Swiss-Prot record:
Chain positions with N-acetylalanine modification: A2
Stretches of the chain forming a coiled coil according to its record: none
Similarity remark: Belongs to the protein-tyrosine phosphatase family.
UniProt xrefs under InterPro entries: DEK_C, Dual-sp_phosphatase_cat-dom, Phosphatase_SSH-like, Prot-tyrosine_phosphatase-like, SSH-N, Tyr_Pase_AS, Tyr_Pase_dom, TYR_PHOSPHATASE_DUAL_dom
Name of the encoding gene: SSH3
Known function: Protein phosphatase which may play a role in the regulation of actin filament dynamics. Can dephosphorylate and activate the actin binding/depolymerizing factor cofilin, which subsequently binds to actin filaments and stimulates their disassembly.
Protein's name in the database: Protein phosphatase Slingshot homolog 3
EC number annotated for this UniProt entry: 3.1.3.16, 3.1.3.48
Subunit (UniProt): Does not bind to, or colocalize with, filamentous actin.
Length: 659
């Protein structure tokens, strides 16, 4: 893709010097002289919304010594071509074609789209222009005219006009199969066949917008609307053979396939399902900028081993759906969109999505609106040998800058499949501390076409190891320093990623809360992947006998029965657990966080509790064996008995002194 800026000026007149003050002449010229920017692709030229008119007028009015405009200024444009798949010769030819087609227009008219069409006779070239006007206060840009342009050959220095079709409110567009579509407006019907699927998709998008605008404005023949189309009607100057092609192709390709029999509906549905499954595979390995719809159908016929002539319109319809999915930016996170070059060139979509930062991961794609958005470029080709890993630290910082401002960022490459998808995966792995498998599953759920090439996948695996090692070192530093890691080890093993999809409805704050909850979730799971720390050990111990723990909590009001049970020796080691959970900030006893105990101290505590419990039980049995008739020993033994019970169960009153 390339960005071309064309200077628009009226044709030079025969007058020598304008009559009147010089500043009035400059102002009149500045109103007419302006620039228009185009995104030039293979087979299509997309007019961009350019805000340079007022700037040009200001510059023109501030330079009274500027020369009068002439037709030569049309060639003094600014061009910025990326090294895409097209050869320099093809790029120069397409650029020259754009200049020649602009010369056919009035100064107040704009090209919204120029799409190259298939030509019946190969030396010739044909373009479809979607043209709107800016003439006068009363006219709006809702008025659109389709123009057909003929070139004798690719190197021709001139072009001619062969078709003029105003778009009225009754305009209808139909798919005719094999990449062709027909436009019916005002009783006239014309057929067009772009040279590639991507060109067809871009053309249909612009046509749909124009048809909706015409319908909303109520443009009907016979009124004052679209009177400027007569200017082009009077200038149809293509050869008669070219004029016949613009009108006769509708009769050649508008034939509809016969309707299916009622009994064959189930078989037809099965065939359509098979076509959908194979179509995705064919498109995945095809270059949408060069492949035609007919070639796609032929590839499907080879895969299925059946003729698909009667499914031409169905194939085109499914292709448009898949291309639309490729063309639409996918919202991966509340603040991050993943898309293609089309999304980067769509100013309306960028503004609607509140995008302020654009991360361009492609070597061949330009920055279309450098004056409107903040850009960061990583100029790499989609090759397995390309090194993305060294750039992921900068891209993460760039994305976080947009999130910190409360705005959104678009990450794009050419198709939003490999380079940009790998960068978004790297961001998710670092930002949300998840594994590569979790990040890939999340991204592909929201954008199924995201498939980094094998080289980028290997770099993502290396990056995953780097992140894991970094988190492990951070945890060990906390352990050496005696600081409780609390929630940090949880995402180290596995951080659930599903809580992220509901977050597009909220902001970044909700995202942080959701991630904290997801990090805390593994703590409640019954010991999957036990860690080498005290929390994991105590969790495993507590899960050995959960029923006994419930019994101990329900019988706290009756202390003597705890030691009268034959399972008291098994229950006592569980008593230190509430204290340890309490010291680690657990949820069993809410008494606030305390300094963490080391593992050696915890083992000593467990042993001491067991000794106290055993001695207490032995003392109780000895007192009970002395007889029922002695009242004073029994009375004196009761307070001591309750005192020892409290020391063993509460564990925070005076256990060290008693031991």
């Amino acid at each position: 893709m390339a960005l071309v800026t064309v200077s628009r000026s009226p044709p030079g007149s025969g007058a020598s010097t304008p009559v009147g003050p010089w500043d009035q002449a400059v102002q009149r010229r500045s109103r007419l002289q302006r620039r228009q920017s185009f995104a030039v692709l293979r087979g299509a030229v997309l007019g961009l919304q350019d805000g340079g008119d007022n700037d040009d007028a200001a510059e023109a009015s501030s330079e009274p010594t500027e020369k009068a405009p002439s037709e030569e200024e049309l060639h003094g444009d600014q061009t910025d071509f990326g090294q895409g798949s097209q050869s320099p010769q093809k790029q120069e030819e397409q650029r020259q074609h754009l200049h020649l087609m602009v010369q056919l227009l009035r100064p107040q008219d704009d090209i919204r789209l120029a799409a190259q069409l298939e030509a019946p006779r190969p030396p010739r070239l044909r373009y479809l222009l979607v043209v709107s006007t800016r003439e006068g206060e009363g006219l709006s840009q809702d008025e659109t005219v389709l123009l057909g342009v003929d070139f004798p050959d690719s190197s021709s220095p001139s072009c001619t006009l062969g078709l003029v079709l105003p778009l009225w409110s009754d305009t209808q567009v139909y798919l005719d199969g094999d990449g062709g579509f027909s436009v019916t407006s005002g009783g006239q019907s014309r057929i067009f066949k772009p040279i590639s699927i991507q060109t067809m998709w871009a053309t249909l998008q612009v046509l749909h917008q124009a048809c909706e605008a015409a319908l909303g404005s109520g443009l009907v023949p016979g009124g004052s609307a679209l009177t400027w189309a007569s200017h082009y009607q009077e200038r149809l100057n293509s050869e008669q053979s070219c004029l016949n092609e613009w009108t006769a192709m509708a009769d050649l390709e508008s034939l509809r396939p016969p309707s299916a029999e009622p009994g064959g509906s189930s078989e037809q549905e099965q065939m359509e399902q098979a076509i959908r499954a194979e179509l995705w595979k064919v498109l995945d390995v095809s270059d949408l900028e060069s492949v035609t719809s007919k070639e796609i159908r032929q590839a499907l016929e080879l895969r299925l081993g059946l003729p698909l002539q009667q499914y031409r319109d169905f194939i085109d319809n499914q292709m448009l759906l898949l291309v639309a999915q490729r063309d639409r930016a996918s919202r991966i996170f509340p603040h991050l969109y993943l898309g293609s070059e089309w999304n980067a060139a769509n100013l309306e979509e960028l503004q609607r999505n509140r995008v302020t930062h654009i991360l361009n991961m492609a070597r061949e794609i330009d920055n279309f609106y450098p004056e409107r958005f903040t850009y960061h470029n990583v100029r790499l080709w989609d090759e397995e040998s390309a090194q993305l890993l060294p750039h992921w630290k900068e891209t993460h910082r760039f994305i976080e800058a947009a999130r910190a401002q409360g705005t959104h960022v678009l990450v794009h490459c050419k198709m939003g499949v490999s380079r940009s998808a790998a960068t978004v995966l790297a961001y998710a792995m670092k930002q949300y501390e998840c594994s590569l498998e979790q990040a890939l599953r999340h991204v592909q759920e929201l954008r199924p076409i995201a498939r980094p090439n094998p080289g980028f996948l290997r770099q993502l695996q290396i990056y995953q190891g780097i992140l894991t090692a970094s988190r492990q070192s951070h945890v060990w530093e906390q352990k050496v320093g005696g600081v409780s890691p609390e929630e940090h080890p949880a995402p180290e093993v596995s951080t659930p990623f599903p809580p992220l999809p509901p977050e597009p409805e909220g902001g970044g704050e909700e995202k942080v809360v959701g991630m904290e909850e997801s990090q805390a979730a593994p703590k409640e799971e019954p010991g999957p992947r036990p860690r080498i720390n005290l929390r994991g050990v105590m969790r495993s111990i507590s899960l050995l006998e959960p029923s006994l723990e419930l019994e101990s909590t329900s019988e706290t009001s009756d202390m003597p029965e705890v030691f009268s049970s034959h399972e008291s020796s098994h229950e006592e080691p569980l008593q230190p657990f509430p204290q340890l959970a309490r010291t680690k900030g657990g949820q069993q006893v809410d008494r606030g966080p305390q300094p963490a105990l080391k593992s050696r101290q915890s083992v000593v505590t467990l042993q001491g509790s067991a000794v106290v419990a055993n001695r207490t039980q032995a003392f109780q049995e000895q007192e009970q064996g002395q007889g029922q008739g002695q009242g004073e020993p029994c009375i004196s033994s009761t307070p001591r008995f309750r005192k020892v019970v409290r020391q063993a169960s509460v564990h925070d009153s005076g256990e060290e002194g008693e031991a």
